[in-house]
Amino acid sequence: MREVLMNEKTNLLQLEEHFYQLVDVDEPNTFRNLFPYSEVPKIAFNDRIVPHNMPEDIWITDITFRDGQQSRAPYTTEQIVTIYDYLHKLGGPKGIIRQSEFFLYSKKDRDAVYKCLERGYKFPEVTSWIRASKKDFELVKDIGLKETGILVSCSDYHIFYKMKMTRREVMNMYLSVIRECLETGISPRCHLEDITRSDIYGFVIPFCVELMKLQEEYKIPIKVRACDTMGYGVNFPGAVIPRSVPGIIYGLNTHAGVPSSQIEWHGHNDFYKAVNNSTTAWLYGASGVNCSLFGIGERTGNTPLEAMVFEYAQLKGTLDGMDTTVITELSEYFEKELGYVQPSRTPFVGRNFNVTRAGIHADGLLKNEEIYNIFDTGLVEIGRASCRERV
């Protein structure tokens, strides 16, 4: 019988959480009812609503040098260090941009890591992404990093079709690899690939429960990054899992026992939902959202980092020391140094941001700039003409 316990957060009595065990299956569950492949995916609802649970502290993590490089020509070492400097300045003294993630495979990758570490910044903390092997764990330790990302694909699409394994086999393999990481003293960040097509309560939650047991055993924090690899996540209240972002974050936090400070959301923009889903992850209990500058990433890209700067400010009521003028400086650097021109209608950085051509809007701006201006955009557009001058 489940015990009745006091919830210290809500100060209400509640039943002890159900213990979710791995559901091993002979055939993959591909949720064909939601993902028919020959048709557009379906968004279904069961109207199970979970409560808002935004952590006291929320932050942004950066993936510009990892996912951001997988869709373009690699950055040079000098370019990486320059962009890292900009990220440090943008994140402000409180380090709202908390971490930045790097490859370690090539000499150029490692040189960039060493040079960024030489800067001595507390934030963004330099972290890595590696293959799940003992040799790579030792590499992370030798470089002096405290945390690394490890890919742990969790949908049956990956488990059965890519890895040719069963759920139990793959879970045992993952736990063995993560234990090896912990043995070296490195804090693992488990990247739950393709979570929005995964069996949340049949695999993801039981796996994360085991991660929390390892954390207790080794006294080393284990983070989980919920990766919406294909951009299927939706933010609508009452949507069914595995597409429900609120449902996923609630499950990780409440049923798997992963603290908010160790939950991070990684979004893709295939259905134009990267920003909304990332904000939703904050609202329902994830402290971290993982972003790339200007959304540069695989396929349609990742969550734009600059967008989440302004989502943060709107939710918290303050920029908390973030220097948003750096966003314009970065955009200009990307154009001049890398030849990357922002699409003209991109919020905050496109050439049409804060520009109006409609006569009635122009008349309003000339009378009072607040009428058709979203806020004092001098916060962003240092060195550029004001909206009144750009009418």
What function would you assign to each model-found segment?
Residues 2-134:
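N-terminal capping/small domains of soluble enzymes
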Residues 10-66, 318-390:
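A mid-to-C-terminal "edge-of-domain" accessory segment
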Residues 55-60, 73-95, 115, 119, ...:
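Alpha/beta enzyme core
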Residues 60-63, 95-102, 124-130, 148-150, ...:
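Hydrophobic faces of well-ordered beta-strands that scaffold small-molecule active sites
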Residues 66, 103-107, 129-133, 153-155, ...:
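Active-site beta-loop-alpha junctions enriched in small/polar residues
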Residues 73, 102-103, 126, 130, ...:
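Hydrophobic alpha-helical scaffolding
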Residues 105-128, 134-142, 165-169, 199-207, ...:
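Active-site loop-helix segments enriched in His/Asp/Glu that coordinate
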Residues 230-373:
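Catalytic alpha/beta core domains of metabolic enzymes, predominantly
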